[in-house]
């Protein structure tokens, strides 16, 4: 839709180029769905069609896919990886020797991007800003994430049992049912269903404890009319900056105190401040930077 550039997607279940099944592999304290061994003929057909190949999280493609070296590549790095991972990746990338432009979505992903290129470019994640949204003034808490330690569903579970929040509804988008949870579980909804859930809630809790590089769901939640309350992870503070409402990560006492104090404030004004802060992630503003990379590299 931009500058008459035609784009197609090569990936699992893509309508353009379906690369086949994925494997769910534990990685970086989570579970990643990875196309480790894509359909080789379809992959090469997709690459042959393109002038520029834009790859998100290039580690697996660079190591396992045997990419042709006669193409223009742009690599976008999202993950916040520890020093051990980045040390080995830097060595491996020197062996692979595929040149390309390296992009990172946040400061937390910078060290990841530098393993491939010493001068990466910052282009944040982006969404289409909803111009006609207002704060959802409802008593609904929302959690989004897998039931794994770093997503910290446990705090959400504990909140659902608190007497002081018995007038609130608790809803979670996650990957499995939770026994004795005092709320509603949505198991792996599709994008349309997810959007409806966001628009029907009002308070999004990002309770993550580590290994986050950006936090796109924070922006999605605000863009759907939710106020966001999050742990004080660097990645989250980079996204929301002064508009953020933060508690000390891993401290349930801090979360309870913050919620109590926040609910004494004007939630509509707090949401408006957050909504104003996410304007810098508007796709219309940021996609132009990728277009320049496509055309000039």
Where are these regions (language model features)?
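Conserved acidic donor-binding segment of nucleotide-sugar-dependent glycosyltransferases
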Residues: 244-253, 260-265
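Short hydrophobic beta-strand element within catalytic cores of glycosyltransferases
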Residues: 227-230
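Membrane-proximal helix-turn-helix segments that form the acceptor-binding/catalytic region
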Residues: 80-102
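Conserved active-site histidine-acidic residue motif and adjacent donor-binding/catalytic loop
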Residues: 37, 175-176, 184-198, 209-211, ...
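Short His-centered aromatic/hydrophobic patch
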Residues: 55-61, 77-80
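Donor nucleotide-sugar binding/catalytic pocket of nucleotide-sugar-dependent glycosyltransferases
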Residues: 97-132
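A charged, aromatic-enriched C-terminal amphipathic alpha-helix characteristic of glycosyltransferases
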Residues: 131, 264-297
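Conserved donor-binding/catalytic core segment of Leloir-type glycosyltransferases
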Residues: 133-151, 157-161, 171
